[in-house]
Each structure stands twice: as C-alpha cells, then as structure tokens.
Amino acid sequence: MVKFRLKALPKLGAQELMFTAESVRDSSRKARMPYTMSLRPSTPYGSKFAMGYETSQYRLQGVEDLYPEFRVQQLSASGSPLVLASGLLKYLDKFPHGCTEQLVSKVFPAMEVLFKSPALAANMDVYALFDDVMVKLRERQTLDGGFTTWSVPGAKPDAYDSVYAAHFLVKAREHDFNVPENMLKKALSYCEEQAGRSPEGPEDMVPAYAAYVLTLGGKVTTNYLLNLEEYYKANYEKSWRKSLGASFMAASYKLLQDENKARGLAGQYLPSGNLAADAANVYLMATYFPDMSENLGKKTVEVLLKPLSSGDFTTDSAAFATLALNALSREESDKDISFSGMKPAYTPFPTVDFVPQTKNLTVSSKRPFYYVAAQQGFAVGDKKTAAAEGLEVSKAFYDRDGKQVSTAKLGDELTVKVIYRGLRKESFGDVAIVDMLPGCFEAVSNSLQTDWNVAASDIREDRVVAYVTADREAHEFTYKVRVIAEGDFIVPPVYGSALYLPLVRANSASGMIKVSE
C-alpha cells in the first residue's frame, strides 16, 4: 500500500488525479489510473441580493468575497421594474431546497416569463426545469389528487401547495407543455374539494384560490363562488372584500365574463405587508384588470419593492412577485443608464459583472431606475464564530462509548449529534438544518435518527439535511459517519434557516478534526 499526502488548493470543482505505476525493470510496462474528486469549501453555496429604486444614482455596497469558480456577481439596472424579476429568477433557480411549493416556484414564474418576456429567460432551460419538477410532482401526488409537501410515504397533501401546483399545471397546459391528463384531472378534482369547503377565516384564501384555478381550467364555478360569497358576507361582512380571496373571486368572475361581479370585487384589496399575498393581488389585477392597475401606477410596484429591498422574501413570495412584475412589464428606454465608465451587456437589461475587488461601482441615469445587485457563489473563509438570529444550532461527535471526541482514527464510526432550538416566542416550522460533512467523513446510509418534529430528512454525499419545527425546547437528531481519510480536516458549521422567515437563521462555529492511522 502506498500513501499520498495531499493539500487542498483554493480552486473549486472537479480535480483529476493521475496515478501511474511503472515497472522498475521495464519502463515500457506501466499502468495509469485517473481519479476525479470534487473540491468544495466549508461554506455552502449562497445568494445575496440588493434591490431598490433610485431617482438618479446608486452606489454598489457590500461586495462579497467569493471564490471565482461558480461565482455570479452582476449589477443590473432599468427603468422597467421587470429588472427586479431578473434577480428573483436567479434566486429561485439556485434555491437549494425542494418542498412542493419551492419546486413549483422554481419553474412557474420562469415559464410565464418565457412566454411574455422571453429575453429575460434566454439563459434558462425552462423545459428541462419543467421535466425535473414534473418527476417530483408525480411522486408526491396522492390518491385524492393533492400533493404532499415532501416525498414522505403516507404523508397527507398540503392544501395550499396542492392548489398552487394545480395552478402551475393549468398554466403549463395552456403553454402546451406536456402535462399528463390524468395528473391534471386529479389535481383539479382536489381543487373542487377545496373550493367546496368553508374558509377557516377571512385570511384563508385557499377555497377562493381553488375556485379560480378551476375556472382557469375551464370549469364553470358559479356555484362555488356564490357559496363563498354567502359565507364571507355572513361571517366577515366588514373585511372580506379587502382580502386576497376576494381578488381571486374577482378574477374568476372575469374569466366567467360576469363583468359586474368582477368589477364589484376587484380593486378593494388592502395590502397586508405579506409579500406573497400582495404580489398575488398585483398579478391578478395586472392580468385581468390592467386598466385598474395602470391607474395605480408606481404605487403598484411600491407594494412589492419594500420587502424586496429589505430582503424579506421567500420562494413563494419571490415567485408571485415575478409573476406580478411580468404581468406589469412594459418597454423602457435604458440608453441613459451608465455604470462608472463600464460598458454594459444587455441581458436584456443593462448589466455589468463585478468582482470582490470592485470598488466605487456606481449606476447613474437621468431618469429614475430600478436596480438589482446579485451575488451568488461560495464565500471565502470559514465561519469561525457562531451566529443565532431567532434560532440556535450546534453539533458534536461521539465515539462508540458515547464520549465526545475531537480526534478520530481511520476506520472509526462516530455518531454526529445535531442540536437546534428556536429563540422566538412561538414555534415555527419549515426550518432547514444543513450539516455539511468534513472531507474525512462518509455518512452511513439509513443511520439518521429523528423525532416527531422532523418533517423530512435526507443523507446526501456531502451533507445531511433535515426539515424541522423549532420551538423553545432543544431538539436533536443523530446520524453515523465512517472515518475514511487521514489528516487534518475543517469541520464545517451546521447551518439552520427558516424557509418562510427569511431573517431567522443560525450557524455553529467551524472547527477542526484530526484523523490518525
């Protein structure tokens, strides 16, 4: 046996090693064996966006130090608010998790942009995205036509996710994508079930959303709409017309060509500060009542801009914001926009690339403009200190005797214990816990042990992921690893993030583990 000691260099991605064995007595007798390995840092791929509106000038700030491989650092600007959608599409495309809503959100707005603003989707293979999502949706569709949040055997369908998926399928069929007839039929059957139930409150828009999807799919839904209106009037007379449910009903009546009913409900929505709901209303207004949305002008976009500029968006809200911006899109001349003397590319908006060393990059224009600074890639450096913003995470390694260790021997089997705790008053679900493995570890298949509040989990080649509910109590899950390499290795932090609370996130500190023979 021959041992080789290797040092990881900064270049990321696939690296090829070539091993050559040659006869000492006869140099013509030799054998060569290539071996490819993937080199990644101790930090996960991340995304950061700055979006906003300026009247004359914007100066780029907060440039991230990212590895050059797989790095995207671009600044775009335009007089059209559709430029904001270019950033949201990048965010959705690289989002690392895949519940049903997130899968649909990855492709639904991209599909709509492809058919209304095709230049914006020029670098996206929307059809390949569609095919990938359809495979997973088939796995998750239940007998009653709904869709489960995760691919977990025996799970029940989620009402909102199911109606949202049905909406996507109806629009995909409209655009001549290959939607299996039986799949769509079952999804619409589930929508009939949802449209026929009573709302659980004025904010429960799922029945109205389901009625809208059915109408969009060619069903006559007058009875559903009349029953919903009767229920709303009896229980929420003062508030229901200001809800998103009323906006969905207005759009449904418009599709049914009942102009009086449609106009009677449209335009009364009261912005709630919830970007997903506010954006859905803008999308419906711009699609079915363009004259009313045009009268609101810039105020319509302002409803979307505030949460986008503060980074307070998720996949759901980003998808509906993209749909809304796409529906509002209009042609704008961007010839007055300049970038500190740099020549922009038009993709389709004026765009320049920058690097971590970039300083004093400024966008200027004689007219007001919207801008997006997109930064995606692997951050240089380790997370040497822990962070806890609404959430705490930590991890430790244990040997077969249950003793906590920071060293190991080649061939050992260790138990990894990941602990998490919510720091908010109320519990919150849909928390992604991502534990990346040191280069010396190999996760043992089927070793993950979880409790009741883990909705789904997955052991991958280089990480373990669990989707959990967090509260004030400490919870844990464990899994086993096998030590497969000798040397000194960085222990990546464990990361936690609430998928629908963008400002709730945490990481443990990175560390080191020494492996001996």
PLM regions and their residue ranges:
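Long, domain-scale non-catalytic interaction/scaffolding regions in large secretory-pathway
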Residues: V2, L6, K11-S27, A31, ...
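Extended, solvent-exposed functional surface patches
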Residues: L9-G201, P207-A211, T351-G390
